[in-house]
Amino acid sequence: MTEAGPVALVGSGEYLPVLDPLERRLLAGRTPRFVQLATAAAPEGQQSLARWHALGRAAAERLGVQQVVVPVVDRVSADDPEVAALVEGAGLVYLSGGSPPFLAATLHGTAVWRAIADAWRGGAALAGCSAGAIALTDHVPDLRHPLREAEPGLAAVPHLRVLPHFDRFAVRLPDVLLTRLVDTPPGVTVVGVDEDTALVGGPMTWEVVGRQSVWVLTAYGRTEHPAGSVLETPTG
């Protein structure tokens, strides 16, 4: 039976040179086919999408692999079989930043998400940065409107909740949001991922990769895990 590929939950820096070592690691031993979805940025318009596609193209060129853009901007395109077919043969599927609720709601239960999940379970690496990392959990809060109910996520890592950009975000994290985020069911771990940093592996054993740290958050405080640390997250 084929083992699922690794998951990378990235705090920031997708497609930038600072995280080339991470993306190279995720592609190592896999098909050199770098599948990219800028869906989370679709509400910002075509200019934003074009920027993400250009960054992704530059990253693929530095890594010497093929860039494949999956042009999902709404649920219609997410359910298009021809669009979903672009995921086939991926070595790495990457969900970049933007709006976490929009990304999760757009992909949830669609042909494209099924294709991504199949590729991942078949051994492809699966990465989400910022909004993408949040959407890979099963609990997607609207960080700009913390009192709104969270949306269901894509549930690739249902035992985690993720706060990206944590080093920048933590200093202005509203108490009401932090209280809600750490109020989790048994077996769910809340992690803050600093910028230019990733939590890589899964589902239970992870490594901190990148420039800074990952933090485990509880009602009693936070514990730092610097780059190179191994972190265990129980699944229930």
Each model region followed by its residue ranges:
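A general structural motif
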Residues: 4, 29-34, 90, 123
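C-terminal and late-domain segments of enzyme folds
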Residues: 1-30, 40-54, 58-61, 140-142, ...
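Class I SAM-dependent methyltransferase SAM-binding "motif I" and its flanking Rossmann-like core
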Residues: 96, 104-108, 112-171
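General beta-strand structural signal in soluble alpha/beta enzymes
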Residues: 9, 69-70, 94-95, 126-129, ...
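Portal/gating segments that form or line small-molecule/metal binding sites
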Residues: 41-98, 102
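Short, flexible loop segments at the rims of nucleotide/cofactor-binding pockets, characterized by
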Residues: 12-15, 69-74, 102-106, 168-169
